[in-house]
Each structure stands twice: as C-alpha cells, then as structure tokens.
Amino acid sequence: MSNNQTLFERAQRTIPGGVNSPVRAFRSVGGTPRFVARAQGAYFWDADGKRYIDYIGSWGPMIVGHVHPDVLAAVQRVLADGFSFGAPTEAEIEIAEEICKLVPSIEQVRMVSSGTEATMSALRLARGFTGRSRIVKFEGCYHGHADSLLVKAGSGLLTFGNPTSAGVPADVAKHTTVLEYNNVAALEEAFAAFGDEIAAVIVEPVAGNMNLVRGTPEFLNALRALCTKHGAVLIFDEVMCGFRVALGGAQQHYGIKPDLTCLGKVIGGGMPAAAFGGRGDIMSHLAPLGGVYQAGTLSGNPVAVAAGLATLRLIQAPGFHDALADKTRRLADGLAAEARAAGVPFSADAIGGMFGLYFTEQVPASFADVTKSDIERFNRFFHLMLDAGVYFAPSAYEAGFVSSAHDDATLDATLDAARRAFAALRA
C-alpha cells in the first residue's frame, strides 16, 4: 500500500471523507488523493516522494509559484513579531492601499479570511445598503458555501431557487434567483419582472468553478447597465480571477466597473486571506460606521498580509501578466493541438493565468455547455497525466492555473505527457 493510500485511510477515521474540502477526495475522478509533502516553484512532491507539475497552485493563490523566496522572506520577517493580535497593524493599511491602487473600482476595502466570508459579507452589505432582499446569481458560478449562494435554478426561468445542499432552508433559498450565465435575454426578463426588488447581482466575470467559462462583453455590459438602471449593487466575485486575468482583475480586462468586488487567493499569497471592497458610499454602511455588521478575529492576520503584500508587489513587475498569459495560452493551444493530432474531441481556452480543458468540440459558454463534456474520457485523461507526473484539477468542472514558475521545460514536459495520454485515449 502506498503512503498516499495509508494516509487517506487514516484521514477518513477522523476527517469526514478524509479531506477538508470535497474536491480533494478524488470522488469525481476515482482513485486515491495525493497527500502533499512539500512544494517548490511549479512542482509538488507527494507522500511517496513522487514529483508533479502542479496546475492547481492551491486553487489559484500560487501565481508566483510555491515558496517564492520574496514571499517566504516576508513571512519569516513578521513571524518573530507575533502571529496574530486582534488589533490594527500598519501592514493592514499597506495591503488596503495596494488593493485600492490596483483595482480602481475599490475605494475602500475590508479584509476577511476566506472567499466565502468575502461574498457573504458583500451580499449582506448590498442588502443593507439597498434595503432589498433578492439576490441574483448564475448557474455554474460558485461563490462559496454561504446558505444563500448554495442555490440552483428552479424549474422555470424566474422561479425561486432550490437549495443544492442539505441544511439550506427553503426560506433562505427563495430570496435567490438563478439565471443562465451569458444569457442576456434571461437577464433582461428578470429585471423586467422584479428589478426593483433586487439587492445585488453577484457574478464571476470569468467563471472558474464550472471549468473556465468567460463572461461575454455583451453579458457583463448588460449586467452593469441593468444594475445601474434599477439601483441594484453589481458584485464581481474575483476571488479566483482577480489579479490573474489582469493586474486589475477581470474588470480591467473587460473595462467594466462593479460596485463591489470580492477578492481572495492571490491576495493571501497562499495564506488564508480575502477581501471585499468597492464604492465608498456603500462601504460606509459597514460597522463601525454603519449598521451592517461584519467582523473576524483573524481578519487582516499579519502573517497572511505579509505573504499577500509580497505577492502583490511581485506581480507588478513589468511584463508579468503578458508573460503569464503567453505561457497559459501556449499550454492550452498545445493541449488542443495534441488532441487534434490524436483525433480526440477536445477544446481548451485560456485567459490570463487561468485555463480550461473540455472534452467537447467547442469551448463552452454556459454551464449547460460544460455538462456536455465527456466526463469518462476526462477522468481517464486525468489519471494518465497524473501517472506521468502532471497534476490537473481532479474534476472536469474546475479551471486550472499557471504560475510564473512554470517555464518552457515544465510546459514541454506537460505537452509530451499529453501526447502520450491522447494517443492512449484514442487507442
């Protein structure tokens, strides 16, 4: 029995399902999860000592690679001064100033410890600001595990949402309306029916949890116009795509200014950190200034802030995002070319440092499109690549990530492994 198997069996005795986040359990793809022993740059090593090229990067935060020396040094500098204080620090001001500088739509920002906290708090703030209750989200977009966001579409376009998780009361779900992503007509119909009831629309401008699906400019511009017309708060959930699609996030890429933005992953540099921020007149409704309560013992944790600040400074290097996008595009195009040469139906897309792999002929534009992917073939591909030392997301519904540490050698090795994997799929 491998060390990974031994650890997984042991973990299941004390941790539900053996993991602390469901996708890690390999339920979708089968087999034994890899327990990570250490990581460096573009690689990690599992409990059996096998090395993998890592295209998850802790699900997005490791944009400069694992254990970057500048990030490590920043963390080491603050450790000797204390791990957590429950009081303000100068570093909190510095990271807030950095975020506001890089994302112009953010006039003020509040630090939290997870993406779920960020979206949950942003929705509460939007409701407090507008005095309304209804939330609009989109099928396939994941915004964390707050009750009001674990909701799927009802049987009709404008029906109340239905809970997708046990433990979510129907009375909570009924305040969430779920529409099809990239469907402008559905959006217009919803606003025509109850636009003046909508507190907020929350959207991933580049979705990453139904695999990678880009918002179309038409769709996102319609969102902005309709929210403005009806007084609803437009929330961009950029926990995943923030600082990855562009230095100023997807909103910079599309040239669209949301009212509130949720950030995470990259701003913690691998540590637990997230944030939400936006217009000053909205943010002023937060306690202690206003009546919308939000708090957190570890919010603005000095160790996490140090890692995040170091990462944000590294990604401002001239040409950083252009180089990252070029690498990611080379990977996506190379995989598509290898599949085409092997005669395997496959498509790929990339934007900034994110990519998507689909066992379909066309790049998807909605969750319904994503569900047409050949899941069995994806699972086989995943394990063939895993055996070859390449670690993609263990689910056909997750985006992948490239870091600045991925070099030509890692990309070449990945494409060589893919050539063999696609040939095996065709056989």
Swiss-Prot record:
Query: Major location, coarse class?
Result: cytoplasm
NADP found in the keyword field:
no
Q: Where in the cell is it found?
A: Cytoplasm
* SUPFAM superfamilies cross-referenced by the UniProt entry: PLP-dependent transferases
As cofactor, the record names:
pyridoxal 5'-phosphate
Q: Name one Pfam family in it.
A: Aminotran_3
Q: Broadest EC class?
A: isomerase
**Signal among the record's keywords?**
no
- Residue numbers of N6-(pyridoxal phosphate)lysine PTMs: K265
- EC number, UniProt record: 5.4.3.8
The record's NCBIfam families line, in alphabetical order, gives: hemL, PRK00062.1
What is the name listed in the Swiss-Prot or TrEMBL entry for this protein? Glutamate-1-semialdehyde 2,1-aminomutase
Species of the source: Burkholderia thailandensis (strain ATCC 700388 / DSM 13276 / CCUG 48851 / CIP 106301 / E264)
User: What is this organism's lineage?
Assistant: Bacteria, Pseudomonadati, Pseudomonadota, Betaproteobacteria, Burkholderiales
